[in-house]
Curated annotation (Swiss-Prot):
GO terms for biological process: SRP-dependent cotranslational protein targeting to membrane, translocation. It comes from Saccharomyces cerevisiae (strain ATCC 204508 / S288c). Present with 2420 molecules/cell in log phase SD medium. This is Nucleotide exchange factor SIL1. Glycans are attached at N105, N181, N215, N233, N315, N333. GO terms for cellular component: endoplasmic reticulum; endoplasmic reticulum lumen. Its main location: endoplasmic reticulum.
Amino acid sequence: MVRILPIILSALSSKLVASTILHSSIHSVPSGGEIISAEDLKELEISGNSICVDNRCYPKIFEPRHDWQPILPGQELPGGLDIRINMDTGLKEAKLNDEKNVGDNGSHELIVSSEDMKASPGDYEFSSDFKEMRNIIDSNPTLSSQDIARLEDSFDRIMEFAHDYKHGYKIITHEFALLANLSLNENLPLTLRELSTRVITSCLRNNPPVVEFINESFPNFKSKIMAALSNLNDSNHRSSNILIKRYLSILNELPVTSEDLPIYSTVVLQNVYERNNKDKQLQIKVLELISKILKADMYENDDTNLILFKRNAENWSSNLQEWANEFQEMVQNKSIDELHTRTFFDTLYNLKKIFKSDITINKGFLNWLAQQCKARQSNLDNGLQERDTEQDSFDKKLIDSRHLIFGNPMAHRIKNFRDEL
């Protein structure tokens, strides 16, 4: 297991580090106001309806109020609560669901800032569609099922053009604040939020000006998506994985480094990955994002920068070995395509190269690697097909890595010496 460097631990508050590493919030005990330390967590005792640590006890069942309260280690949550990650502390909190948000008639209160409700400056092709959306939202304190149906129809019309290079840029530059608000609004049905995120994703794909606009004009958007991911994953909604995949797709389209995301993001991604273990497509999207973040933090062929990368990686994630295990397993999956094979292998390659013996490689991966070396060497020796230089380069890298990175470097040198004879 790769451990967090002591210098990093000293730079962070013990409360935040503990909440990040242990997947749960460490807060004041309601009755005594004392802080539960990380060591105390090892001695949690559950007795009846209480959880105790060194004679300090709190209820086993979380007792919600109308204001946000911290969720203590080991507590069980009643159904129907609002759950969030506190963006200032990184701690998980819950409160009673405000009855005014969802009425008996299935209406939804939509909280949209006045800034997002402002009409787009200047008319363009989709002004009328978004004007209709704003009128629906602005004229009703709550949204009925009919209102939601009309909003969905508007999204369907816009979706036809969102993938277009010019149209996508116009939509985002005029309407992104509203689209982002609708995508992240927890008071709306998932279907409507999913449509809004789909528009954003369609506009982002293969459209660098859109990527640049969002990245520069809305720098906090990525952190807000991570918080929404956490809340959505905790909701246990049967359709939440669809919206989770949309959120992950947006993050994968934007430039992301570890510094762009909250410190608890690696825990959120691990929880999403584990809870959706039957959804292989979703898990692939999580690993894509992990690969993207680690790659963005890395600078090749510079010892100083490699040291910095190692420090940043350990700071961002305390469980790099666990991610390495997932990459080893996923890269062996026969259902993934060559592009994902390259991406996940390269990530594992870099982790092993930098962290060396701190990253353990299992026998299953080594057996897979041996088989891949044989098959890819055969392809390299085959002169019957037109060469793909990018593919050839990766194949050679994989073959060399068997001994040079994942095995005995001396064996690599001996093999090369024999090949030259």
